[in-house]
């Protein structure tokens, strides 16, 4: 694969309800299902990713815009429990996200060069957005 080639792009809704509906072990509440069409879409994406040669998965979630600027994860691992402030009874999810910090730093630098307000998040206690957690859990 040539260096720097984008091999796939997708736009994926990522409400935390999707994870809740799957009843994964790491989510505390349980559900009786729901959101099937969206869950099937994520399952299809996961199958597609298994057929593609790629080095990194980049997730951009617009929810981070509610903070100031665009944030990039700047530690090798973010591991915690996410309790969503809007849906605390639905989304209490234990996550463990691995980060390619070098790639994240380069993306942050390039975005900044193009006039985007950016920040590297190097605080281990930073609350990772549920859009990222939802997307990572399915891919």
Q: What do these predicted regions represent?
A:
Residues 118-130:
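Short, surface-exposed recognition loops or helix-turn segments adjacent to catalytic cores
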Residues 2-110, 114-120:
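A short aromatic-anchored loop/beta-hairpin motif
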Residues 12, 133-134:
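N-terminal accessory/precursor segments of enzymes
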Residues 139:
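Conserved small/polar residues in nucleotide/adenosyl-binding loops
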Residues 40-41, 130-132:
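Short amphipathic alpha-helical surface micro-motifs
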């Amino acid at each position: 694969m040539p260096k720097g080639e984008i091999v796939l792009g997708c736009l994926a809704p990522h409400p935390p309800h999707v994870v809740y509906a799957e009843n994964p072990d790491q989510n505390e509440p349980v559900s009786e299902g729901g959101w099937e069409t969206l869950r099937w879409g994520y399952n299809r994406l996961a199958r597609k990713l298994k057929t593609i040669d790629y080095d990194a998965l980049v997730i951009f979630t617009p929810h981070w815009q509610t903070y100031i600027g665009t944030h990039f994860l700047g530690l090798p691992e973010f591991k915690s429990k996410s309790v969503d402030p809007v849906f605390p009874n639905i989304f209490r999810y234990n996550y463990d996200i691995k980060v390619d910090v070098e790639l994240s730093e380069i993306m942050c630098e390039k975005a900044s060069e193009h006039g985007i307000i950016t920040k590297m998040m190097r605080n281990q206690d930073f609350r990772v957005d549920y859009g990222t957690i939802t997307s990572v859990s399915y891919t």
